[in-house]
Amino acid sequence: MTTMSDLDEIMVAEILCRTPMTCLKTVRSVCKKWNALSKKWFFFGKAKQFLGFMMMDSRVCSLRFDLRKDLVVEPPSIKQVSILDQIEVSKIFHSDGLLLCIIKNDTTRLLVWNPYLEQTRWIQPRHNFHILDCYAIGHDKNRKHKILRFVDDFLPVENVVFGGNTYFFAKERYIFEGKGPEEIDITETEDFLLCFDFTAERFGPRLPLPFHSYYAETVTLSCVKEDQLSVLCQRQPSEPSEILEIWVSTNIQPNAVSWSIFLKVDMRPLTGFQFNDMAGSFFIDQENKVAVVFDLDPSQICRYQTAYIIGQEYGGYFNSVNIGEVPNLWIPGSVGYADTTSCIPPVCSSYVPSLVQIG
């Protein structure tokens, strides 16, 4: 009689590709062979899929997104994370397979979660958190994980983790010194990357971007697996074009970076609107030479989280997939949906499993 352990690797791989990442603990317990294959498949066989996490109604959900070679988009698989069912989360940060969860309406603790091992750990600070606190999680050269906490009283700060260090998109801040905003030329405000080195526990020098962005232009960061950093810039709409660029790092260190262009597309004939860096994120598929941008659609009647698939071939490939309706975050009693800047970013960075024990 054939048992589960007798199935060949191809059949097991097919089962694994249909298994939510948050259910792998059950799969790994079937037998030693399945446990070994699950690690091999996750760490070496997931190049064709995007794995990530998204927020829906203050709940953390896993997201599996397939993009086939013919650019046909499979419906995304979205599963609420059962281990976090009783917790309302306001934001999530990702670092090398670990997720840092900011708890909604709770200033006394944070939660670190390893989805692959299904382990959680509560972190309590010496002093209570503040509503303006920003966070990042990373590790030093000895793989000791640390949490960075700081305050920014202007805008939410976006960051991505690469090589254990955290990279921020930043702009030079002007001090008006009695002058009105109309008297200040902000078109030449310097923008750059900043790296927080978790080994040295300090910020490095300003790192150059491959472009100069202006006010109201969209700039957002992402990682290409564990190997490269990528940055998206969508230019301010101007006749006759609306250019979107994505650059990928060819070399990156805490004190140096170099770039190469990955994608450059005129978005005006494709979408007719500008992505919002406060509401979404993106990842790239280097084999198919496409980018997938997660954002909120531009309608004020009803808002949906949408995945936009963009390519450069054939004059600009474009497709979109509806992920789900966004809850109405507007003031009670008002008509319409909140502006994108009032909404929670829908998708976290792509996920690579970790064997780090935190429980």
From Swiss-Prot:
It comes from the Eukaryota. Pfam families: FBA_1. It comes from Arabidopsis thaliana (Mouse-ear cress). This is F-box protein At1g10895. Residues 2-48 form the F-box domain.
